[in-house]
């Protein structure tokens, strides 16, 4: 602002034609009040809107801290939960937890006021830390989708320390890639002063004449030492990276591998139905005629427990279809929730960075839409622990144990048939397959036992701990009904 503009708000009582008009000091108290009013008028949101946004962000952050904290605690406190799949879930929960903690102080509060309240270090830190955690979260979800597909298809056991170490290495690689993607935020974001009144002579409260400047410190992509075109190119590059790795790549991976997994499960459900087809009906006339000759032998063969009835076959087929439909719905929810939560933020950020919304009449509206889209995308840190943790039965058992132990201060009685099993594509592939396309479940069991088909194969028992439950076919392997019930591959 020019001196004559400031003089309209803080009149010094001197004629503009005076020789000392430019150097005559202003009243310091008047300038301070004027600057405060100007700063208040430039606040992006009204007090009512600030209360609403702050309340919603607090609810999101608290819910995310509780949900992701429970997931982390469930994996860390017991060795049986430290599997390859759970290491990836732990990595996702850790990134979401950090984002929940840093959301309000580093993302929301600086956006309320026109001035950035922190130092140069926190200007970089406040952008790099949330940015790298968002990238880590989305990349982990992508890796989990790939791992989930190959886990179910090949049934790779993941429980020992060496195999979990591979998952830890994958998680570290995800963090490194996330930091590299956030590196432009560290290099090019700086604090800069936006001055309103610079080097103005004022008289302070003690009556001394001093020189002061009034302005706001802002954290932004600065062009100091660089041409404006280069700064704009850097901004566009960061926007393209954000759209690609925060939305397009994760959504593409989720869609492709979840569709492949859904088709795989439906195909094997059909194979299972054919394998469990009811036997050929027995002719009553022949039965009656033969029973007169050899009643005891044929009666025992007809009532043999190894021959499933038509009713039990239909029941098992319906259960299989229900499990497949439930899993399909969960996979659709994973991809759909990600697409719905991140699309508004990705779209509005892309439009703002490429200056496709430059109408000054709608600046306030764009500010509110942008903040609302950010708030919607932050809901993912609450949804992720629910989709990847609470819908897993093994995690629910651990959450129940944590509740009884630390809230009710008592020990929960463990069910007799509790089952801990996990599969992961990061683990080494088992060479001793238990099932092939030419063999049925019954013949496989007979070959392994040599006497009856009710025993499980020896190789399968050595790799998986079974408490109870019948076996089911998935692809060219055998998994458990209880495993499918617990959604351990999801």
From Swiss-Prot:
Lineage of source species: Eukaryota, Metazoa, Ecdysozoa, Nematoda, Chromadorea
SMART domains xref list: 7TM_GPCR_Srsx
Designated name of the protein: Probable G-protein coupled receptor npr-8
Region (Disordered): 272-322
Localization terms from the record: Cell membrane
Skewed-composition ranges (Basic and acidic residues): 280-289
GO CC terms in record: plasma membrane
A GO molecular-function descriptor: neuropeptide Y receptor activity
Low complexity bias locations: 292-313
The entry's keywords: Cell membrane, G-protein coupled receptor, Glycoprotein, Membrane, Receptor, Transducer, Transmembrane, Transmembrane helix
Highest taxon listed in the record's lineage: Eukaryota
Membrane topology: Multi-pass membrane protein
Membrane side Extracellular: residue ranges: 1-55, 108-125, 188-236, 353-374
Function: Not known. Putative receptor.
Transmembrane segments: 56-76, 87-107, 126-146, 167-187, 237-257, 332-352, 375-395
Predominant place of localization: membrane
Cytoplasmic side: 77-86, 147-166, 258-331, 396-490
Glycosylation sites: 17
CDD domains xref list: 7tmA_NPYR-like
Any Pfam family the entry gives: 7tm_1
Family recorded in the similarity comment: Belongs to the G-protein coupled receptor 1 family.
